[in-house]
Design a protein with these regions (language model features):
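Conserved N-terminal glycine-rich FAD pyrophosphate-binding loop of Rossmann-like flavoproteins
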Residues: 79-117, 300-320
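Flavin (FAD/FMN) cofactor-binding and adjacent substrate-gating region
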Residues: 100-143, 325-329, 333-341
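Flavin (primarily FAD) cofactor-binding/catalytic cores of flavoenzymes
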Residues: 1-81, 143-269, 273-522
């Protein structure tokens, strides 16, 4: 049996329990059925497995069900209770509760592959009063010239996904647990190894044997800035120096009880949201909160490499309606990126990338007032070090163009949102080592235009991936609502070519849309 890419164990493995992974399996890049059986791991046959269980899994399953694949042929392996659970957690801690609006456009509807009726149309129909009904329609009709881009409320997105989840019988396909690894099966197919919850199975692991696997694990992990991590670890202070993507409600509650100074780091959408929360609390409760905002790069106006790749800016911020220019989802940038390889693709990603935030009149008015009244100040520089200061404060030392600058603050909220390397995710790292997967030009998981993970095909079996782990591929907007749907369409188009699901032609699409409109279960 061929065993390419055997990886030596750095540390001894714990003794294998009943139905657990043993050294033979851990060290083998391809498994036989006999190897798995000898380890006492039960094997379950299922044609299509998706794991992660977030919105990426949800929209892919939605496409498959609409294309006629029965629930019995699909399994969703996930620790999540709902597909939007992780996403809602991240939005909530980064100050986007259900009543606030997301950074997504009207037609990016994960519950509706057709995009119509859009969120704006639905909001208009459900609103009370003529003014409230006309507002979303007028907004999308005049954006972005006479109004800011329309964006849906987070709660509307989650509620509509719940409705579609029930319509496609999503929960019938869900198996609870944490995926440990995916390995190629000798002779074709894959084994996806699941660790079920305690007490849910008589064995430690279960192996799902399938022809198709889809990976949608979301972000590989959160990466903290070195100075932030050093301070937290050295001084065991995880409450005053926080990342915006972790639970930090205590910061706002403390400031509601006494005056304080907060340092904000970062210039993206999360920084905008954190500032809004601080200023809303200040206005609503009459607080005396002082805000220091540190920009590493201060934007004073329009900027970019050429007149065709320019972005508005001002007061430190780079402005853009969405994560990427809208043409990446269906215009010239999507077409251009699809043709590029290697360094050329990486260069275009760099040109399109960079931290940015949408223009919202309410935010700009808040910050303008803060600058005029003196309680919101900006600093251009980088953090040199942080140490405990007097009276329970943090002494922050900055490097600026004018020289060193230091001062004491009560809290530091880091809003840079750095993402960890894919090798820090156990399953993705295992794919790199054992499955033949590689990295794309910017270091993420390398996928084909069909979102098949390059180098992992096993005879007629295919392994796909979508979401942020694949950023850097032939399609840029992968970690967005619409991007996940476009990836799901590409994947299911490819599956239709090999006969796993039906084509989505005009007749079937129209019939299925009509079923969606009437909320008819499929």
């Amino acid at each position: 049996m061929p065993q390419p890419g055997i990886r030596p164990q750095i540390a001894p493995n714990p003794p294998a329990g009943p139905g657990d992974l043993n050294n033979d399996l851990l060290n083998s890049s391809q498994w036989t059925d006999q190897q798995v059986a000898a380890a006492g791991i039960p094997i379950i046959d299922i044609p299509f497995v998706t794991f992660g269980g977030g919105i990426g899994s949800f929209v892919t399953v939605d496409y498959l069900r609409i294309r006629g694949v029965p629930p019995e042929a699909i399994r969703v392996l996930t620790p999540l209770n709902t597909p939007w659970e992780s996403y809602e957690y991240l939005t909530r801690v980064s100050q986007i509760p259900r009543q606030e609006r997301l950074r997504s456009d009207s037609a990016s509807t994960p519950d509706n592959i057709w995009g119509f009726p859009s969120y704006a149309v639905r909001e208009a129909f459900s609103a009370k009063g003529i003014k409230n009904k006309l507002f979303p329609l007028w907004n999308v009709a005049t954006e972005p010239i006479f109004s800011n881009y329309y964006t849906p409320k987070a709660g509307a997105a989650f509620e509509s996904m719940e409705k579609e989840m029930n319509r496609i019988r999503y929960n019938e396909m869900v198996v609870r647990g944490q995926v440990r690894m995916v390995r190629k099966r000798f002779g074709g197919g894959y084994f996806t190894v699941l660790t079920p919850p305690d007490g849910a199975s008589r064995t430690r692991r279960i192996a799902y044997r399938s022809r198709f696997v889809h990976i949608a694990v979301g972000y590989a992990g959160l990466k903290f800035l070195p100075d932030l991590e050093e301070y937290r670890t050295k001084y065991n202070d995880f409450s005053r120096v926080v990342n915006a993507y972790e639970q930090h409600e205590h910061v706002y509650q403390t400031l509601q009880g006494r005056p304080g100074t907060v340092m904000i780091r970062g210039g993206g959408i999360v920084a905008s949201r954190v500032l809004q929360r601080l200023i809303d609390d200040r206005d609503r409760l009459g607080l005396q909160t002082q805000i220091l905002h540190v920009f590493r790069t201060y934007i004073t106006g329009s900027h970019g490499d050429s007149i065709f790749m320019r972005r508005k800016g001002g007061d430190g911020w780079a402005y853009q309606g969405f994560n990427y220019p809208k043409s990446v989802w269906g215009g010239q940038l999507k077409s251009q990126m699809r043709k590029l390889e290697g360094e050329q693709r990486a260069a275009l990603y760099k040109a399109m990338g960079g931290t940015n935030t949408p223009v919202r009149n309410s935010w700009q008015a808040q910050l303008r007032r803060g600058r005029n009244e003196g309680w919101y100040r900006t600093i251009v520089g980088t953090m040199d070090s942080m140490t405990p200061g007097a009276n329970g404060t943090i002494r922050a030392q900055l490097k600026t163009a004018q020289g060193p600058l230091d001062g004491n603050v009560d809290f530091v909220i880091d809003c840079t949102g750095l993402e960890a390397d894919i090798s820090e995710h156990r399953v993705l790292d295992d794919l790199l080592v054992h499955a033949g997967a590689g990295r794309n030009p910017i270091g993420r998981l390398d996928v084909e235009r069909t979102f098949e993970v390059r180098g992992t095909r096993n005879f007629d079996a295919r392994l796909y991936a979508s979401g942020s782990a694949t950023l850097g591929g032939y399609f840029p907007g992968v970690d967005t609502f619409l991007g996940l749907q476009i990836a799901a369409q590409e994947i299911t188009d490819d599956l239709a070519k090999v006969g796993f699901c039906g084509p989505l032609g005009v007749a079937r699409s129209t019939a299925q849309w009509w079923r969606w409109v009437r909320n008819r279960q499929i």
